[in-house]
Amino acid sequence: MRIALVGKGGSGKTTVSALLIRHLAAGGRPVLAVDADINQHLGGALGLSEEQAAALSPMAAHLPAIKDYLRGENPLISGTEAMVKTTPPGRGSRLLRLEEENAVHSLCATRLPGDMENVRLMVTGGFEEKDLGVSCYHSKIGAAELYLNHLVDGPDEYLVMDMTAGADAFASGLFTRFDLTCLVVEPTRKSVSVYQQYREYAKEYDVTIRVVGNKVTGPDDVAYLREHTGADLVACLSASHYVRAQEQGRDKGFDTLEPANRTALARLQLEVDAVPQDWAKFTRQAVHFHLKNAHAWGDRATGVDLGAQVDPDFVMGPEAFAAQS
């Protein structure tokens, strides 16, 4: 199951992402954590030191190798230079499983230590000096979008992505690659406005949205969030001594997280687990955004008719993965 966490900058989505990842890991679930935020703070929130986080190998640095591996023997893709971030899989493409060992995981995924050993972390990579003034951050997350297009995941295994802030997620089709999108919303007008903007953008794409209230101080905050987000609100997180200790570099152990906050995370997991995986919709949306990007810039940039890469008889999912074995 795939969960994206988004929200206003400063809403605490990285903190909530890390809490959810720790909750799933504590339950023995395999988790792939992906940091796709420009600030790249998820590693630190999961307990890595600054040196360990800096040593992570970003997906963006391995984009040519990732393309080459995912292309496999797909006859509709002439070469890796013709692959763009939206390129959908087809017959002959290499599909991925979340727990398997493969070339992409070997290059980009780091298994976390200690009680997080069932968690692997991938990072898209932050801005470097050479990028400043000449590149946008969405060029960094292309590898993550390709990865998600080729991933076959199932129940009781989880991909949790800490996304870019606000409505930036709509700069590509990445926002349709998840089973559930969780908006982290503070009980403030600005934070609620980001939720409303996101819901408006997403409504025509059948995106499942839920809200987790964060930095909630009491019943008035809960009532405010309920008034403005309605049934989308599934849980609320309050101030946490555990989180503060983590942010200060003092690991007190996840079992010291406040019971009410643990209950909130369990509710969010239940919401994710209740979403049926619709691989036909997933495939349709992948093709839709690929063709949209092809017409907007892809054909011109590659010199290739990217629409010809679409395999009309291919549907992503477990059956497609089984067929390649």
What are these regions (language model features)?
Residues 5:
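Hydrophobic anchor at the beta1->P-loop junction of P-loop NTPases
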Residues 9-10:
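Walker A (P-loop) phosphate-binding loop of P-loop NTPases
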Residues 13:
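Conserved lysine of the Walker
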Residues 19, 134-253:
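Conserved catalytic-core segment of NTP-binding enzymes
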Residues 25-115:
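N-terminal phosphate/diphosphate-binding loop that engages ATP/GTP or pyrophosphate donors
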Residues 33, 119-121, 233-236:
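Conserved beta-strand scaffold positions in the cores of enzyme catalytic domains, especially
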Residues 94-114, 123-159:
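Cytosolic-facing regulatory segments adjacent to core modules
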Residues 201-325:
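C-terminal lobe/tail of nucleotide-utilizing enzymes
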